[in-house]
A protein has these predicted regions:
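FAD cofactor-binding and catalytic pocket of flavoenzymes
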Residues: 1-21, 26-31, 36, 85, ...
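Conserved redox-cofactor binding core of oxidoreductases
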Residues: 14-148, 371-375
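Alpha-helix N-cap/helix-initiation motif
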Residues: 22, 123, 169-172, 177, ...
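A glycine-rich dinucleotide-binding beta-alpha-beta segment and adjacent secondary-structure elements
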Residues: 90-95, 106-114, 149-154, 158, ...
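Glycine-rich loop(s) and the adjacent beta-strand/alpha-helix scaffold that form part
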Residues: 137, 146, 150-154, 162-236, ...
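A conserved FAD-binding loop/helix module that cradles the flavin
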Residues: 415-436
Length: 446
């Protein structure tokens, strides 16, 4: 549950233009978003201790919950090693209850965490916080198992609602005075592109061909350290990741941006296979022997590299392939920007340094490679900006072409930081929601 750094909102001003990139500053700043970061941390629930992180932006309050205890063996190995290197390690912020909070119990620290449902409901998200609270008000209705076909508009260019397939695959219409699109970076772009009409033949917000472009994700690079002794990598203290450093998010010589580094989440044996030494046979007795040798003798350090946006990295509608409902599926195109590869390889080398200092016998880097952009944490396809010619939504998330349609998710990110963007998505949602409510109450959206 990371806040972006102040520098992440002004990448173009800090680093200048990058060839073949659409790198730009956000139209808002960290200071604009700080109150909503705090709101997200307290309303959703974040644990940890980020006080030692000297690189973070100003904050008015500490996190609402302390870091999780007890500490794992990896923490005991990695934290002093980072300090010896002159880094500034600290406990990760998590959307997990370290103590009972908001009527739900604390984390049990089991290893089956990432990718699994929480047995104690201690993992925090909208599903067990703001959505249930909204339903209790009886002022909203939650429709599940539905698929939106298009945002409908009238002859004046004003949205009138959405057409959608219900849980029984029947096409229905939901009238609305305000439409908020929050489908994620690929699907929000897809929905706007599918919402074609006489006034908007290329889709909503796409008058200048920006919908779907600037697709970004996070390339995770790092290193695996193999230790002579049993480092209790899997000591059943979940979720695994516990210590991080932000020393390489910015100020890397010759590079724009960077990313956070931390140890990995607990990996089940089937997940660990990809982290065996590269010369390990992929099957047979030798493979089993390597699993026994390395499974509890390794530590992984990696992190999300900030991707450099590019015009050709994009979401489009596939001209041929249709889904179950006959709608065009998403087609992704555009490779990872070369500068992102350089950033990723720099991060991998720094992770290797950390592991060697921690006492690893040998280390293998997991370096960046070319390929399709938009890996984990997709963002950027409905860029926020003040100029309708170079963005899709304004600084308040309103689609430039349609004054009662808002896009509120990671697709509005101008850049995607060197962190998991979930807290930024939540903070932006609180900010946008407040603005929409104020506009409605003032009569501006009626």
């Amino acid at each position: 549950a990371w806040r972006f750094m102040p520098q992440d909102f002004r990448m173009r001003s800090l680093y200048g233009a990058i060839e073949d990139s659409t790198l730009e500053d956000w139209p808002i700043t960290y200071d604009d978003l700080e109150p909503y970061y705090e709101q997200a941390e307290y309303e959703i629930g974040v644990s940890g201790d980020v006080t030692p992180n000297i690189f973070q932006g100003p904050r008015k309050k500490p996190l609402p919950m302390p870091p999780m205890v007890p500490k794992s063996r990896e923490y005991e190995i990695l934290k002093p090693a980072a300090e010896r290197l002159g880094l500034h390690p600290f406990d990760l912020p998590f959307l997990i209850n370290s103590v009972p909070y908001n009527g739900r119990s604390a984390c049990m620290r089991i290893r089956w965490c990432v990718g699994f449902a929480c047995e104690t409901d201690a993992k925090n998200g909208t599903h067990n916080t703001v959505i249930p609270r909204a339903l209790v008000t009886r002022n909203c209705l939650l429709r599940t198992e539905c698929v939106v076909k298009e945002v409908m508009v009238d002859d004046r260019g004003k949205a009138t609602g959405v057409a959608f397939f219900d849980e029984n695959d029947r096409l229905q219409e939901q009238p609305a005075d305000i439409v908020v699109v929050s489908c994620g970076a690929t699907e929000s772009a897809r929905l706007l592109l599918m919402s074609k009409s006489k006034l908007f033949p290329e889709g909503l917000g796409n008058r200048h061909d920006w919908v779907g472009r600037n697709l970004q994700g996070h390339s995770y690079t790092g290193a695996i350290g193999y230790f002579p002794e049993d480092v209790d990598t899997y000591d059943d203290i979940g979720p695994g990741a516990c210590v991080a450093a932000c020393d390489y998010n910015h100020d890397n010589p010759g590079l724009a941006g960077g990313g956070m580094l931390c140890n990995e989440f607990i990996r089940l044996p089937i997940q660990f296979i990809g982290n065996l030494p590269r010369d390990t046979p992929r099957w047979g007795l030798a493979h089993k022997a390597a699993m026994r040798r390395y499974y509890q003798h390794n530590i992984g350090v990696k992190g999300p590299t900030q991707e450099i946006p590019a015009w050709d990295a994009r979401v489009q509608l596939d001209p041929v392939v249709r889904d179950y409902w006959g709608l065009p599926v998403v087609r992704l195109s555009g490779g990872i920007h070369p500068h992102t590869l350089d950033l990723g390889n720099h991060q991998a080398a720094r992770a290797a340094d950390w592991l060697r200092e921690a006492g690893a016998d040998f280390v293998e880097e997991r370096r960046a490679g070319p390929g399709l952009t938009g890996h984990q944490h997709q963002a950027g396809t409905c860029r926020m900006g003040s100029d309708p010619k170079t963005s899709v939504v304004d600084p308040w998330h309103r689609v430039h072409d349609v004054d009662n349609v808002f896009v509120v998710d990671a697709s509005v990110h101008v850049t995607n930081g060197g962190f998991n963007p979930v807290l930024t998505i939540m903070a932006l949602a609180f900010r946008a929601g407040e603005h929409i409510a104020q506009e409605w109450q003032g009569g501006g959206l009626r």
